[in-house]
A protein has these predicted regions:
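Helix-to-loop junctions at the C-terminal end of transmembrane segments
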Residues: 91-102, 186
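C-terminal ends and interior cores of transmembrane alpha-helices
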Residues: 113-125
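Intracellular juxtamembrane helix-capping segments at the cytosolic ends
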Residues: 142-155
């Protein structure tokens, strides 16, 4: 009796990840070469790059920063502990939210929150350093966790692994380029300015992101 109740395949509920395409619209199965020729790839990779400075510019020296801003060494260690908690929470919670409201709105929320926290972090003192840093690690890890689903939504499933790898190159570029720029600019002020600029750039890139249009079928002669 149970088998009589099953349908093959089971009906699929509409999801935000379908990018607003109608049910009759063909799915996208872009190869890495095709993906690299799209505007959407460069916007996504740019957003990934811009997500890095808010955390990676500060994580190597977060203990020192906490002590410089009024914490003793034992208290400053909580920035590492709560930063890890924030990272884990971001990876678990925000992909769930993106399943409900869509990847693009989720990423825009995360970049907006990261922007606000980066501005507050510039002036944070004492335990506020710990709290704000935990919030920044939440946003950073959440953006990374949503990226594979965003990649699949935009470019299709068959080449999802390689396509995601190309998108993740943005993180590698950001982790190298932003510290270099901060060192050239001056570590203390430059790090905060670059973190704010990165959040603005990431928000703008995701705001400009639109679904990849499927190739048009050739017109019959």
């Amino acid at each position: 009796m149970g088998s009589a109740l099953l349908t093959d395949p089971p009906p699929e509920k509409p999801r935000p990840s379908q990018q607003g395409r109608g049910k009759a619209a063909p799915g996208l199965d872009l190869s890495p070469g095709q993906m690299l020729r799209t505007r959407q790839y460069w916007l996504c990779a740019g957003a990934v790059c811009c997500s890095t400075p808010a955390v990676l510019l500060f994580s190597p020296s977060i203990l020192k920063l906490g002590m410089e801003r009024g914490l003793d060494e034992k208290s400053a260690l909580w920035s590492v502990v709560l930063g890890s908690v924030g990272s884990a929470a971001g990876r678990l919670l925000m992909p769930m939210l993106s399943d409900k409201i869509g990847r693009r709105p989720t990423d825009m929320i995360l970049f907006a929150v990261s922007l606000g926290l980066s501005a507050v972090f510039w002036f944070a003192q004492g335990w506020a350093v710990v709290a704000v840093y935990a919030g920044l690690t939440f946003c950073y890890s959440a953006l990374a966790a949503v990226l594979p689903a965003l990649s699949t939504d935009l470019f299709g499933f068959p080449h999802a692994g390689v396509n995601y790898g190309f998108l993740a190159l943005g993180q590698s570029v950001g982790s190298l380029a932003f510290p270099l720029m901060a060192n050239l600019w001056g570590l203390e002020q430059g790090r905060h300015i670059l973190a704010i600029a990165g959040a603005v750039g990431g928000f703008a890139a995701i705001w400009a992101l639109r679904p990849v249009q499927p190739p048009r079928a050739p017109r019959p002669n």
